[in-house]
Amino acid sequence: MKVAVLGAAGGIGQALALLLKNQLPSGSELSLYDIAPVTPGVAVDLSHIPTAVKIKGFSGEDATPALEGADVVLISAGVARKPGMDRSDLFNVNAGIVKNLVQQIAKTCPKACVGIITNPVNTTVAIAAEVLKKAGVYDKNKLFGVTTLDIIRSNTFVAELKGKLPTEVEVPVIGGHSGVTILPLLSQIPGVSFTEQEAAELTKRIQNAGTEVVEAKAGGGSATLSMGQAAARFGLSLVRALQGEKGVVECAYVEGDGQYARFFSQPLLLGKNGVEERKSIGTLSTFEQHSLDAMLDTLKKDIQLGEDFINK
């Protein structure tokens, strides 16, 4: 199993690479790519960790050597948020970066499962899909927007509020990956209930958690370590499913049946070919249903922005 991390010299990329070096199954290969010249050195640094995961780093304009034979590609390349920016302010820079890298994936490892971490995810996933489609290699079961950070934040905040162990809580999060499009299904957590006010306040905190980190870092960056953890969890789940493990379920932002929007985050059963089944989002509370209805315009506009970036 070969996993490639694109954007591996950045804050998310380094955290992700460290976790993968420690947690990928023995015999796996990990390849790191970034435009920054430090990348081969990051790989050398990580290569001293005593796990049976082969690691190699590549830098420069050409990601091809890193992508050859990859089963899973995780893209975290791009610029980070600064205070006062929202995820859509990143669009102008990051759209071009994602387009370029996905074009290289289409040429070099078109059958790989691709997880997009680069924000704004609502839009960058649509860009990736259109690039792959133009190249004639798009498989909607193999392209994912990584929204796992919303899930792990939800698990943490719910556990804090309700005095539970974070490992015992699993909150499904649907919709998209920014602002109002993030919708934690708090009504679906077994054995936990919320007042309407609690649900509204907690939902808002989960939606704004990224901004909480950006402001706390006072201009020094955005959520890199928790995002690295989230991306590693998703990447490792994907690897386990590709290797034939049954019953692996994760939420991610994928192209579905278009009931809500062309791309939508929902629980997925993962398998040997990527998405095996898009699972139902279940019964929503009145608050959740209202939030879902209210977000769809925003989500559809975000998606349209990505489609237009490639097709206009």
Curated annotation (Swiss-Prot):
UniProt: NAD(+) binding residues: 7-13, 34, 94, 117-119, 227
EC number: 1.1.1.37
One Gene Ontology biological process: malate metabolic process
SUPFAM superfamilies, per the entry: LDH C-terminal domain-like (SSF56327), NAD(P)-binding Rossmann-fold domains (SSF51735)
GO MF annotation terms: L-malate dehydrogenase (NAD+) activity
Gene3D superfamilies registered for this protein in UniProt: Lactate dehydrogenase/glycoside hydrolase, family 4, C-terminal, NAD(P)-binding Rossmann-like Domain
EC class name: oxidoreductase
Keywords, sorted A to Z: NAD, Oxidoreductase, Tricarboxylic acid cycle
Catalytic activity: (S)-malate + NAD(+) = oxaloacetate + NADH + H(+)
Residues given in the record as substrate binding sites: 81, 87, 119, 153
GO cellular component, one term: cytoplasm
Residues at the active site: 177 (proton acceptor)
Subunit structure: Homodimer.
Family designation: Belongs to the LDH/MDH superfamily. MDH type 1 family.
Role noted for this protein: Catalyzes the reversible oxidation of malate to oxaloacetate.
Family matches, as HAMAP family: Malate_dehydrog_1 (MF_01516)
Protein name per Swiss-Prot or TrEMBL: Malate dehydrogenase
Taxonomic lineage from the root: Bacteria, Pseudomonadati, Pseudomonadota, Gammaproteobacteria, Enterobacterales
Gene, per the UniProt record: mdh
